[in-house]
Amino acid sequence: MKIDHEIELVDTPGLFGFKEKEHDSDKIERYKDITKKYVSEAHLILYALNPSNPIKESHKDDLNWLFRMLNLLSRTIFVISRFDEEADIEDEEDYNKRFKTKKENIQKRLNDLISLSEKEKEGLSVVAVAANPFGWGLEYWLKHKEEFQKLSRIKTLQDATQKKIKENGGKLIIIEEAKKASFKMLFISKYPWQKKSNKILRENWNI
């Protein structure tokens, strides 16, 4: 989906949860390949999280690939979806309290799985939204936009996106970093011996 002829949003199949939904291993790998291609080329990552159990032990390999191999953590916003299932979105105090707990949990799980530096912990971007509050549907919310803005907390995601762009040096720098990640993906796919290929990338292309 293109927005204002400048931004293209790509909703990928995701990297996790295939075992529950799909039993065809070839199809699972195809889905993952599609996702990995788009992710490696992305300027910013909106990482959608399950509100009840955001990050699992089984995610470790893919988290390492995303945030260590491709170095995408600084360009990632973690989005806790369907937060109206976890908090009273009409109660600011309850929302803030539960969001704080979830954010701390996400930081801890990431640290357990991929060992975050202090700088990464401080720079971790997490928001919690309710894209369809109370399940009332698009038609209703299009007629009640002001209420939607308040309850959905979509503005927190918009603000986090703008902040990420600034933190990463603006649009042009982000585009260059995305090219590096895409090249890493291509190179590692062609030369899958991980440690050696990483060494070659660092020595020859400064990535």
Which residues fall in each region the model found?
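Extended helical scaffolds that flank P-loop GTPase cores
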Residues: 145-207
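Globular "head" domains of long coiled-coil molecular machines
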Residues: 1-167
